[in-house]
């Protein structure tokens, strides 16, 4: 659809489809179609053209149905070889190559065209298609993709609609290329040996000249690829002048686009040795703990041992996936040499970028606008980037803010590209406290920067005015500029909405260049339909993007995560377009980095330990987990396909070989994997037009099997022929047989609320349903199929976002993550028992198990944190009096724990402050959010009591630096950790009082108990500071609840006192008789 042509809204279920045009705008006049004597091709909409004799080209001699020569030749070679109107088989015309089934011809005046496909400007499979004013040459590589496409729709192109109806250009080569796809069979003509070979043109002078020309071209090509195998050269190739430079460029272009940078062995080997030693020490430690119970405090001892065993298992699940950490390095210059050479059409893959937002009051439109602006200004060919914004709250505020953003982008994007600034989100660029004149050499930069800053400030004022206007909702609902009622006034009951703001025919920037396509999408919502929150919105974006642009790769970001590096897409393509990695890589995950966090990162918002240690460790196994944002996907992986694995990938790993020995027969899992690969190859076979099947087209012997294949695809992907056709375009781009006029209705259809019914969406395809943390589940399903993922961590962070620095918001965020993990733990997709028939590696499975079981650690953790207070109150302890031999185990255990942590910091580069903050928040979250998540998850799964999904507030600091850090917001999550703090403080006072009253001999055991209790309080210290706030004042409600719970607990303990026997109680009360 044309940009700025108006919003499209509708519902497939209600048979509604309307176009709401901007106020005062009239429908744009249609461009006059190119024609010759009124003849326009009814397949592609191009000129029919003329024949070799100068007459109008007539493809069908029976009905003269207007078809141009390129479409005629394509139908003969790749299609059904019949006229679309009368179904008469096409005959060969002079100048066209022969295809199988053509009648024998005695005349030999056209043998060149009869036997061979011409290159360059010739007509044939590498014909030139004139489209939108430019020539595009389809190579055999792109034809190889086309012949797999189901020809489900056809029609004439409508001016002003989606222009890229041809396969995306990154699969198109220039006409001078002699590239031939080896997977495409060469046309063969059967030669009758009884005839003279000269009659076929063989051994003639022309034939010999063609053979000589072919050999010369092959020799030239061999010279170009000679540098690929340097060991095969007899000596160094001495190239001088431009020829030598060209050879060097070709050699550089064939080098890998990335490489693995291993951790230095002197760091990694010592780290592994300490892990093994720690495991051995743990075995001796538990042997001592189990065989030496505390007789007078058996309950305390038993609880402590159970907790310690669980902590050890948790450590194993967390530690071993970090066994083989790696770093990666990309080469953007090699990517440019191979796919994006200057002066040549870019061969980079098309990418669709998804931005998701729900509530503009919690996710300010200005933040979303900055994210969109950073995407539109990215360093990537504009015709290869499309930005889709999902508004799942159907807010008119988001729509109007996006309209203002599109207008400001016309000025902002050329400014960014002209002066090469970073980052390209204006709010964060102008807020940088750096020397912005560094490395700037253009005298006009200062003046233009000052003018652009003023433009941005005016843009902010307009956005703020929209936000202020949205605070008061009219009683009759919102209305658009032309007086039409806003279709999304009811966020739970509204039609689907689509608006294209930028892109083709959407206007140019201030420098006269095109901008990337910007599309607003709000999926249909109706009562009685399950919408699956963010996962459902992302799946709707997959489908609508496949219909409109169909980028080969997808990148999703949250609305508050802007592009901090304009090279982010190129960084991802260094892996996705690498011949060795791309075919088996499902996604490239980038680390999350944040702005606006306090200097000391009180609540571990940066999560450095996870992103810089755990994720690097997973990258050395099967790849990092998907974290929900900043991730570039292979579209085929989201469609549920298996990866293209090599024989080496399918071989049993070295552990299996060493344990089981060599085997002559292939393992069952190996054969199953090969069978799945074969099934995937078969599923890529062409799917044909249903109408053609019904009419009995020649060449298909089993029509029923084709029909069943079509029904299987509809059951899998839904009933959208255009979308199904797009799934076969593995290199991206719109199927050439698609009618652009039908794209609007089809886009509305695929985002309708009932489209996913009785399909595999959310089960095997797209983002997987069943958890509020759909990211973990989606990545797990891909890894279980055998895909690998890549962790890309360039020196400059590619994405930055905002994090909740307020204590209550942070705990609510952690609660949502933990609740999602509990839901997965109690589902059929639990990594403990799911996916054993797939290709998921053992250590990768351990990492996923750790990801879903960590909330359960909150139960033993909170029990262990209360134990010090109980010991101080009862004058008991969890450990008996130990000898020097037993004390050695405790010393070695603590030493191994610290050694492991220090060595991790050494090879990862993480600071000790970040490590300590992570340890502190592990206790804070474990005693609050994780504990609540366990019980809420049980209620949701077992009792069906659902909890509300709350969007984390992303409002900016407007009252000063880190003002939000000191704001207190009441939540029940604060009660458990506050209770633990009060109990430990009370226990310390009671223990010290008891030691003072009992004399000197009580101080020795007291120190161990006090150290235990102080250790708990130190971990909860950031939480205590958060309770105090800026005024060092804790809310009364928290104090009352915590003291009440602590008092009740203490009184009950004194009353029950489970460690005193009935006889001792009787003695204490003076009730003992003579038999005592």
Swiss-Prot record:
Key word Glycoprotein present: yes
Residue ranges of the region described as Disordered: 119-179
Active-site residues (renumbered): 392, 775
Protein location: Cell membrane
GO biological process, one term: cellulose biosynthetic process
Annotated positions binding UDP-alpha-D-glucose: 356, 362-363, 392, 533
Keyword rRNA-binding tagged: no
Keywords: Cell membrane, Cell wall biogenesis/degradation, Cellulose biosynthesis, Coiled coil, Glycoprotein, Glycosyltransferase, Manganese, Membrane, Metal-binding, Transferase, Transmembrane, Transmembrane helix, Zinc, Zinc-finger
Reactions the enzyme catalyzes: [(1->4)-beta-D-glucosyl](n) + UDP-alpha-D-glucose = [(1->4)-beta-D-glucosyl](n+1) + UDP + H(+)
Pathway assigned to this chain's UniProt record: Glycan metabolism; plant cellulose biosynthesis
Entry's cofactor comment: Binds 2 Zn(2+) ions per subunit.
Ranges in the topological domain labelled Extracellular: 289-296, 873-884, 942-971, 1025-1033
Membrane-crossing residue ranges in chain numbering: 268-288, 297-317, 852-872, 885-905, 921-941, 972-992, 1004-1024, 1034-1054
Cytoplasmic side: 1-267, 318-851, 906-920, 993-1003, 1055-1076
EC id: 2.4.1.12
One MF annotation (Gene Ontology) recorded for this entry: cellulose synthase activity
CDD domains in the record: mRING-HC-C4C4_CesA (cd16617)
Binding residue positions for Mn(2+): 534, 558
Binding site for Zn(2+) 2: 60, 63, 83, 86
Glycosylation sites: 948
Chain's role: Probable catalytic subunit of cellulose synthase terminal complexes ('rosettes'), required for beta-1,4-glucan microfibril crystallization, a major mechanism of the cell wall formation.
Name of this protein: Probable cellulose synthase A catalytic subunit 1 [UDP-forming]
Organism expressing this protein natively: Oryza sativa subsp. japonica (Rice)
Originating gene: CESA1
């Amino acid at each position: 659809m044309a940009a700025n042509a108006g919003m499209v809204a509708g519902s497939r279920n209600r048979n509604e489809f309307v176009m709401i045009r901007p106020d005062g705008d009239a429908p744009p006049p249609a461009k006059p179609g190119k024609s010759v004597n009124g003849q326009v091709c009814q397949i592609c909409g191009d000129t029919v053209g003329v024949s070799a004799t100068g007459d109008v080209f007539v493809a069908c001699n029976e009905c003269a149905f207007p078809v141009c020569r390129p479409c005629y030749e394509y139908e003969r070679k790749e299609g059904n070889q019949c006229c679309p109107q009368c179904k008469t088989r096409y005959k060969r015309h002079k100048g066209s190559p022969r295809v199988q089934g053509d009648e024998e011809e005695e005349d030999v005046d056209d043998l060149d065209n009869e036997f061979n496909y011409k290159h360059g400007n010739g007509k044939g499979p590498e014909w030139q298609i004139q489209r939108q004013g430019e020539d595009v040459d389809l190579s055999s590589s792109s034809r190889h993709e086309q012949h797999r496409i189901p020809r489900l729709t056809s029609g004439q192109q409508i001016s002003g609609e989606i222009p890229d109806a041809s396969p995306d250009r990154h699969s198109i080569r220039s006409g001078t290329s002699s590239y031939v796809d080896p997977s495409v069979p060469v046309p063969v003509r059967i030669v009758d040996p009884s005839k003279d070979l000269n009659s076929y043109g063989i051994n003639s002078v022309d034939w010999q000249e063609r053979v000589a020309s072919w050999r010369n071209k092959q020799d030239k090509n061999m010279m170009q690829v000679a540098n690929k195998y340097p060991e095969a050269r007899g000596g160094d190739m001495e190239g001088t002048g431009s020829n030598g430079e060209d050879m060097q460029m070709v050699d550089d272009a064939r080098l890998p686009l990335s490489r693995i940078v291993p951790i230095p062995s002197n760091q990694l080997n010592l780290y592994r040795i300490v892990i093994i030693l720690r495991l051995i020490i743990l075995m001796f430690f538990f042997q001592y703990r189990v065989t030496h119970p505390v007789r007078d405090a058996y309950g305390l001892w038993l609880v402590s041992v159970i907790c310690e065993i669980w902590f050890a298992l948790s450590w194993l699940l967390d530690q071993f996936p970090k066994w083989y950490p790696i770093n990666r390095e990309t080469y953007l210059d090699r990517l440019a040499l191979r796919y994006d050479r200057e002066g040549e059409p870019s061969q980079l893959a098309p990418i669709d970028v998804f931005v998701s937002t729900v509530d503009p009051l919690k996710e300010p439109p200005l933040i979303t606008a900055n994210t969109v602006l950073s995407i539109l200004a990215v360093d990537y060919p504009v015709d290869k980037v499309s930005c889709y914004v999902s508004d799942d709250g159907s807010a008119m505020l988001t729509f109007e803010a996006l309209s203002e953003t599109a207008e400001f982008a016309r000025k902002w994007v050329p400014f960014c590209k002209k002066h090469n600034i970073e980052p390209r989100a204006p709010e964060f660029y102008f807020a940088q406290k750096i020397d912005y004149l560094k490395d700037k050499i253009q005298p006009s930069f200062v003046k233009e920067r000052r003018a652009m800053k003023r433009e941005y400030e005016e843009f902010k004022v307009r956005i703020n005015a929209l936000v202020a206007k949205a605070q008061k909702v009219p009683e009759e609902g919102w209305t658009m500029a032309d007086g039409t009622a806003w279709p999304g006034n009811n966020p739970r009951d509204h039609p689907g909405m689509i608006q294209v703001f930028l892109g083709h025919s959407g206007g140019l920037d201030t420098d006269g260049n095109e901008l990337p396509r910007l599309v607003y999408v709000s999926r249909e919502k109706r009562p009685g339909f399950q919408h699956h929150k963010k996962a459902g919105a992302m799946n709707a974006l997959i489908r609508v993007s496949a219909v409109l642009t169909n980028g080969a790769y997808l990148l999703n970001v949250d609305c508050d995560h802007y592009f901090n590096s304009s090279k982010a897409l190129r960084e991802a393509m260094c892996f996705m377009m690498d011949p060795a990695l791309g075919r088996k890589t499902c996604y490239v995950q980038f680390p999350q980095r944040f702005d606006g966090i306090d200097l000391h990162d009180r609540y571990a918002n940066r999560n450095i330990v996870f992103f810089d240690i755990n994720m690097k460790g997973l990258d050395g196994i099967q790849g990092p987990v998907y974290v929900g944002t900043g991730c570039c996907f292979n579209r085929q992986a989201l469609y549920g396909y298996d990866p293209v694995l090599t024989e080496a990938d399918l071989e049993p790993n070295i552990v299996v070989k060493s344990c089981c020995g060599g085997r002559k027969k292939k393992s069952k899992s190996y054969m199953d994997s090969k069978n799945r690969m074969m099934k995937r190859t078969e599923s890529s076979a062409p799917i044909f037009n249903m109408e053609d099947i019904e009419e009995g087209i020649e060449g298909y012997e089993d029509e029923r099997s084709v029909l069943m294949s079509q029904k299987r695809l509809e059951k899998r992907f839904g009933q959208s022929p255009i979308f199904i056709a797009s799934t076969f375009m593995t290199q991206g781009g719109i199927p050439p047989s698609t009618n652009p006029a039908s794209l609007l209705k089809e886009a509305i259809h695929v985002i309708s609320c009932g489209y996913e019914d009785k399909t595999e969406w959310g089960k095997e395809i797209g983002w997987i349903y069943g958890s509020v943390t759909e990211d973990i589940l989606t990545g797990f399903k891909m890894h279980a199929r055998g895909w690998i993922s890549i962790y890309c961590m360039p020196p400059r962070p590619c994405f930055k976002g905002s994090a909740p620095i307020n204590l209550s918001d942070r705990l609510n965020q952690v609660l949502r993550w933990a609740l999602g993990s509990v839901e997965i733990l109690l589902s059929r997709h639990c990594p403990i028992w799911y996916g054993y028939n797939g290709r998921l590696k053992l250590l990768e499975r351990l990492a996923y198990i750790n990801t879903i079981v960590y909330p359960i650690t909150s139960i033993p953790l909170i029990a262990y944190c209360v134990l010090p207070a109980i010991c101080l109150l009862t004058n008991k302890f969890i450990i008996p009096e130990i000898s020097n031999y037993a004390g050695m185990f405790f010393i070695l255990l603590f030493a191994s724990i610290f050694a492991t942590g220090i060595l991790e910091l050494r090879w990862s580069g993480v600071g000790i402050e970040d490590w300590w903050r992570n340890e502190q928040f592990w206790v804070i979250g474990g005693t609050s959010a994780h504990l609540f998540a366990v019980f809420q998850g049980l209620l949701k799964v077992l009792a069906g009591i659902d909890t509300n999904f709350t969007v984390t507030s992303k409002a900016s600091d407007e009252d000063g630096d880190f003002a939000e850090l000191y704001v207190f917001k009441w939540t029940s999550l604060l009660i458990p950790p506050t209770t633990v703090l009060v109990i430990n403080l009370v226990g310390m006072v009671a223990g010290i009082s008891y030691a003072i009253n009992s004399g000197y001999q009580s101080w020795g055991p007291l120190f161990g108990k006090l150290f235990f209790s102080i250790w708990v309080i130190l971990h909860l210290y950031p939480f205590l500071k958060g309770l105090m706030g800026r005024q060092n004042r804790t809310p009364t409600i928290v104090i009352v609840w915590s003291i009440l719970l602590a008092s009740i607990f203490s009184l009950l303990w004194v009353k029950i006192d489970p460690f005193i026997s009935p006889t001792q109680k009787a003695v204490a009360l003076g009730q003992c008789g003579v038999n005592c």
